[in-house]
C-alpha cells in the first residue's frame, strides 16, 4: 500500500471508529460490535473504500500483540505456574473436544477428513482480542471464571505452533528428510530470547529511565514489543506469544506500571483497527449465496463451544452463575482461524468455497458474542436481582436505601461493613457474580450489573437514596458514573475513591469534593505510628498527622493540572516550608503543655 493510500486508509479507519463506536455504545451493543460494523461499512462489500483487506488485517494483529504484552506485565512467573492446571488441563480439553466434534460435523458436510481436521482446530480457537476486551468490560478479569478464560486463551496461543506444523503433514507435502538442524536452531534462539530477556531487560530499562526523557522510554517500550513480535514471527511462532513472554519477564520489574502506561494508547487504537479489519473481511457474496449453510454453521459453532466450555467450567468447579459468562465470552471463532485456513488453502486442502464459508462463519460468530453477552447479562440481572422464594429476608426495613455503594472489592467491603454495622440502609452494586452471591447469602440487598446503566441505578433506589459511594477499580468507570449521577440524580451526595492525585484532580474538576485516596490515609496512619516509635508523644504525632493531612489537601486543590510545572513546583516548595514552620511551632507549644493521651490502637 502506497504512502498516500495508507494515509487515506488511516483517515477512513479513524472516521469509521469515531462514527460507529459512540453509536454502538448509545444502542447498548458495545464497542467491539461497533468496530465490526464499521469495518463492514467501509470494506469491499460495503462502500468499497478499502479493498486490500489482507495486508491491513496482518498489520492490525499488532493490537493483539500489544494486548498480550500488557497481560504479561500483570502476570509474574510464579502466578503463571499457579495457572498450569487450568492452562494445560481445561485449555487442552477445550481445544481437543471442540475440534473433534467440529471436525466430525465438517466431514458430514462433505469436507475431506484432512480439511475437516484443520477446520475443526481453527474453529475451536477463540478470539483473544475480543474475549479479553469483553472480560475487561464485564469485570470478569478479577473473577475465577475470568482467570480460567485467560488460561484457555493462553493455551490456544500455545497451540498455534503444533497446529501450523500439522497442516503440511495432512497435505502430504512434508519433506522426506526432516531438517532437525533448523528445528534445533529455532529452539536455541527461543532459549536465548528467554535468558537474554531475563537478565538484560531490567538493566537496559534502568539505563533508559536514567535519561529522564519520557519519549525515549516510550520508544524503547515500542521497540521491545515490536522486536519480540518480529523475532517470534521469524521463528514461525506466534507474535502474541512472544510479546506475552516479554511482558512476563518484566512483570516483577520496577518499570511495570510505566511500561503499561506507555503501551496502553497504542493497544486501544490497534485493537480497534483489528476489529474493523475483521469486519472488512466479511464476504457478503458468500453469505448471500450460502445463507442457510452459514446461518446454521454459526449457530452450531456457538452452541457446541458453549456446551463444551460450560461442561468444563462445571467440572473445574466454577460457580453456576459464572459458567454462562465463561462459556459465552469464548464461544466465537478467533483471529487464528484466518492464519490457519490461509495456510491450509496454500496447501490445497480446501475445495471450492470451503475456506470462504469457514471464514464467514468465524467472522459472524465474532459478531454474535457481544449480543450474546448482553443477553446473558440481562438474564443474570433478572435472576440475581429479582426476588426469589428461598432468599433470606434482608435486615433492611424498606426498599429505599440511604446509601448506594458501587463496588464490593477490598475498598468497598470496608465501607459497606462500616455502614451496615451502624444500621444504615445500603444497596450494593457489583459486577462480580461471586461477590453478589456471597452478599445475598448473608441477606444483604445487592444488585448484579453495570452501575453505569441508568436503569440499574433506578432499580437500586438511586432516586430515593441520599448518597452514593463509588469504589470502582477503573478511574474511567468512576468518572462516567459521576457524570451519570450528576445528570440523572443531582440530589445524590457523591463520595468517591481516587487511586492517586491524578484521579483526585479529575474528581475535583468534576465537582466532587468528598473523596479518599486509597493509600493516603493508611500511609498517614503508619507515618504517625513511626513518629511514636521514634519517641514523639502520641498526642503530638496525631496533631502532626492532622496538620499534614490538611496542608496536603490544600495543595491538592491548588496544584490543579492547568498550572504549569514551574508553578506547581514553586507552590509545592512553599507548602513544604509552611508545613515545617507549623511543626516547629507545634513542638514548642507541646513542651509547654501537659501530656495529652497515650498511644492507642
UniProtKB/Swiss-Prot annotation:
Which SUPFAM superfamilies does this entry report, sorted A to Z?
NAD(P)-binding Rossmann-fold domains
Q: Where are the transmembrane segments?
A: 4-24, 29-49, 55-75, 87-107, 111-131, 152-172, 177-197, 207-227, 230-250, 262-282, 284-304, 324-344, 356-376
UniProt membrane topology term: Multi-pass membrane protein
Please list the GO biological process terms of this entry. Answer: proton transmembrane transport
Q: Which domain of life is it from?
A: Bacteria
Q: Could you tell me where this protein is found in the cell?
A: Cell inner membrane
Matching InterPro entries? Cation/H_exchanger_TM, K/H_exchanger, K_H_efflux_KefB, K_uptake_TrkA, Na+/solute_symporter_sf, NAD(P)-bd_dom_sf, RCK_N
Q: Pfam families given for it?
A: Na_H_Exchanger, TrkA_N
Q: Domain RCK N-terminal spans what residues?
A: 400-519
Which Gene Ontology CC terms are recorded?
Answer: plasma membrane
Q: Which UniProt keywords apply?
A: Antiport, Cell inner membrane, Cell membrane, Ion transport, Membrane, Potassium, Potassium transport, Transmembrane, Transmembrane helix, Transport
A molecular function GO annotation? glutathione-regulated potassium exporter activity
Q: In UniProt terms, what function does this protein have?
A: Pore-forming subunit of a potassium efflux system that confers protection against electrophiles. Catalyzes K(+)/H(+) antiport.
Spell out the HAMAP family in the cross-references.
K_H_efflux_KefB (MF_01412)
PANTHER family, per database record: K(+) EFFLUX ANTIPORTER 3, CHLOROPLASTIC (PTHR46157:SF4)
Task: Give the quaternary structure.
Answer: Interacts with the regulatory subunit KefG.
> Which family is it part of?
Belongs to the monovalent cation:proton antiporter 2 (CPA2) transporter (TC 2.A.37) family. KefB subfamily.
Q: What is this protein called?
A: Glutathione-regulated potassium-efflux system protein KefB
Source organism: Salmonella heidelberg (strain SL476)
Name the gene for this chain: kefB
Amino acid at each position: 500500500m502506497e504512502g498516500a493510500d495508507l494515509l487515506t486508509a488511516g483517515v477512513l479507519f479513524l472516521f469509521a471508529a469515531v462514527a460507529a463506536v459512540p453509536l454502538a455504545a448509545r444502542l447498548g451493543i458495545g464497542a467491539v460490535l461497533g468496530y465490526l460494523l464499521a469495518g463492514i461499512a467501509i470494506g469491499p462489500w460495503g462502500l468499497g473504500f478499502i479493498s486490500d483487506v489482507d495486508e491491513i488485517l496482518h498489520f492490525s494483529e499488532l493490537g493483539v500483540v500489544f494486548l498480550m504484552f500488557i497481560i504479561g506485565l500483570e502476570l509474574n512467573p510464579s502466578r503463571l505456574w499457579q495457572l498450569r492446571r487450568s492452562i494445560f488441563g481445561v485449555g487442552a480439553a477445550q481445544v481437543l473436544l471442540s475440534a473433534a466434534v467440529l471436525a466430525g460435523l465438517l466431514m458430514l458436510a462433505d469436507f475431506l477428513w484432512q480439511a475437516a481436521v484443520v477446520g475443526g482446530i481453527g474453529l475451536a480457537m477463540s478470539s483473544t482480542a475480543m474475549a479479553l476486551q469483553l472480560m475487561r468490560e464485564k469485570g470478569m478479569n478479577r473473577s475465577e471464571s475470568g482467570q480460567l478464560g485467560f488460561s484457555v486463551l493462553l493455551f490456544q496461543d500455545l497451540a498455534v505452533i503444533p497446529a501450523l506444523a500439522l497442516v503440511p503433514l495432512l497435505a502430504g507435502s512434508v519433506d522426506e528428510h526432516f531438517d532437525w538442524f533448523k528445528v534445533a536452531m529455532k529452539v536455541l534462539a527461543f532459549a536465548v530470547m528467554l535468558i537474554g530477556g531475563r537478565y538484560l531487560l531490567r538493566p537496559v530499562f534502568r539505563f533508559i529511565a536514567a535519561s529522564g526523557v519520557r519519549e525515549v522510554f516510550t520508544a524503547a517500550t515500542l521497540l521491545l514489543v515490536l522486536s519480540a513480535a518480529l523475532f517470534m514471527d521469524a521463528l514461525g511462532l506466534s507474535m502474541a506469544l512472544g510479546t506475552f513472554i516479554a511482558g512476563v519477564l518484566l512483570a516483577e520489574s520496577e518499570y511495570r506500571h510505566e511500561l503499561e502506561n506507555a503501551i496502553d494508547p497504542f493497544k486501544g487504537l490497534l485493537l480497534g483497527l483489528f476489529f474493523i479489519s475483521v469486519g472488512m473481511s466479511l464476504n457478503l457474496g458468500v453469505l448471500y449465496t450460502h445463507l442457510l449453510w452459514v446461518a446454521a454453521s454459526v449457530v452450531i459453532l456457538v452452541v457446541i463451544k458453549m456446551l463444551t466450555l460450560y461442561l468444563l467450567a462445571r467440572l473445574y468447579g466454577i460457580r453456576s452463575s459464572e459458567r454462562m459468562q465463561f462459556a459465552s465470552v469464548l464461544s466465537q471463532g478467533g483471529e487464528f482461524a484466518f492464519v490457519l485456513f490461509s495456510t491450509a488453502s496454500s496447501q490445497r486442502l480446501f475445495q471450492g468455497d470451503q475456506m470462504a464459508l469457514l471464514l464467514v462463519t468465524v467472522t459472524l460468530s465474532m459478531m454474535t458474542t457481544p449480543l450474546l453477552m448482553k443477553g446473558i447479562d440481562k438474564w443474570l440481572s433478572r435472576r440475581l436481582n429479582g426476588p426469589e422464594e428461598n432468599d433470606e429476608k434482608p435486615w433492611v426495613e424498606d426498599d429505599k436505601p440511604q446509601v448506594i455503594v458501587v463496588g464490593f472489592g477490598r475498598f468497598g467491603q470496608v465501607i459497606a461493613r462500616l455502614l451496615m454495622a451502624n444500621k444504615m440502609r445500603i444497596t450494593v452494586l457489583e459486577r462480580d457474580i461471586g461477590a453478589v452471591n456471597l452478599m445475598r447469602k448473608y441477606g444483604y440487598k445487592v444488585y448484579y450489573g453495570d452501575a453505569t446503566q441508568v436503569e440499574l441505578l433506578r432499580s437500586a433506589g438511586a432516586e430515593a437514596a441520599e448518597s452514593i459511594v463509588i469504589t470502582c477499580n477503573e478511574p474511567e468507570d468512576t468518572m462516567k458514573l459521576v457524570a451519570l449521577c450528576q445528570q440523572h440524580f443531582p440530589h445524590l451526595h457523591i463520595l468517591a475513591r481516587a487511586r492517586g492525585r491524578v484521579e483526585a484532580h479529575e474528581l475535583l474538576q468534576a465537582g466532587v469534593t468528598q473523596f479518599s485516596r486509597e493509600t493516603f490515609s493508611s500511609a498517614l496512619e503508619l507515618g504517625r505510628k513511626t513518629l511514636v516509635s521514634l519517641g514523639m508523644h502520641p498526642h503530638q504525632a496525631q496533631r502532626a498527622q492532622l496538620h499534614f493531612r490538611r496542608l496536603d489537601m490544600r495543595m491538592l486543590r491548588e496544584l490543579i493540572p492547568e498550572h504549569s510545572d514551574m508553578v506547581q513546583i514553586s507552590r509545592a516548595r512553599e507548602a513544604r516550608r509552611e508545613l515545617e514552620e507549623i511543626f516547629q511551632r507545634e513542638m514548642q507549644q507541646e513542651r509547654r503543655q501537659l501530656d495529652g493521651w497515650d498511644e492507642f490502637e
